[in-house]
Regions:
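Well-ordered alpha-helical scaffold segments within catalytic/enzyme domains
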Residues: 124-135, 179-196, 244-261
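Extracellular/oxidizing-compartment recognition motifs
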Residues: 1-110, 121, 136-142, 159-166, ...
Length: 261
């Protein structure tokens, strides 16, 4: 949402606007400040925020006339549905739909604090978009794929979040998920858009050529720019590397067959 308020105040009063999710991540999230002028005035925050409630901190002497918000979302309609005889699962599906909706912006992203897409997250959300949204929703996945390959480094490394500004570190396992069966190839399964596959295939092939096998014919671990495979303890990195590499090769093989390479 973009929060809105209408007040009557003297000049120079500072109003703070944030949501209850402002401290919800590892870093503080977005907020807004408004400095009043004399008289009756209204203000709508320029940047969208996400949370369960909007918190306005109003200085003494400011008369609040009205508060509100404008909901913003990606231009898509929800065509998929799920209904069963267990209300728990019906509610769970609606919550999942709402979460997906909140993550669909000009990129697939966490609306609390991110303004670019982590592609490991995009793999998960894109699978939901194919089930729940109309064709406009699928266009967001196409854009995400194009963003990923457009930001490929000269040495073949793929990384996210993209579009990038202050980050260029590869998370290898996430990139395998991105280019593989449940990432880029899943887009083709649900759209039949072979033109996009033809466009991105060379980038996927170039990236996977960076991965090598050891003397046991298991994939060699790549540390990338951020050596992170999963949350928690006792992470079986070797299993994860080989499982995601296998799925990535399956996606690449499907692309090659489609394109006759």
């Amino acid at each position: 949402v973009t929060p809105y308020l209408k007040v009557k105040a003297d000049a120079g009063k500072l109003i703070d606007i944030r949501t209850d999710n402002y401290k919800g991540g590892s870093e503080y999230n977005v907020r807004a400040e408004y400095v009043t002028r004399e008289g009756v005035q209204s203000f709508e925050a320029f940047n969208y925020m996400n949370g369960h409630s909007v918190v306005y901190t109003i200085p003494q002497g400011v008369e609040v006339i009205e508060v509100g918000y404008r909901e913003t979302r990606f231009n898509t309609e929800f065509e998929g549905s799920f209904v069963c005889d267990d209300e728990f699962y019906n509610k769970l599906w609606q919550k999942a739909l709402n979460t997906m909706n909140l993550n669909m912006r000009d990129a697939i992203q966490d609306p609390d604090r991110e303004r670019s897409q982590w592609w490991g997250d995009a793999v998960i959300v894109s699978g939901e978009i194919f089930y729940a949204c109309d064709l406009n929703g699928k266009s967001l996945v196409k854009k995400a794929i194009e963003n990923l390959v457009d930001w490929q480094k000269d040495d073949g490394v793929l990384y996210s979040p993209v579009p990038a500004g202050s980050w260029d570190k590869e998370l290898p396992v996430q990139m395998l998920a991105s280019v593989g069966k449940y990432g880029i190839w899943n887009y083709y399964v649900y759209t039949g858009d072979s033109a996009t596959i033809k466009e991105v295939y060379p980038a996927v092939k170039k990236y996977l050529s960076l991965w090598k096998l050891d003397e046991r014919n298991l994939v060699k671990h790549r540390t990338g720019g951020w050596d992170w495979s999963d949350w928690g303890q006792d992470i079986d990195v070797c299993v994860l590397d080989n499982a995601w590499y296998s799925l990535a090769l399956e996606g690449l093989a499907n692309m090659a067959t489609l394109l006759g390479d």
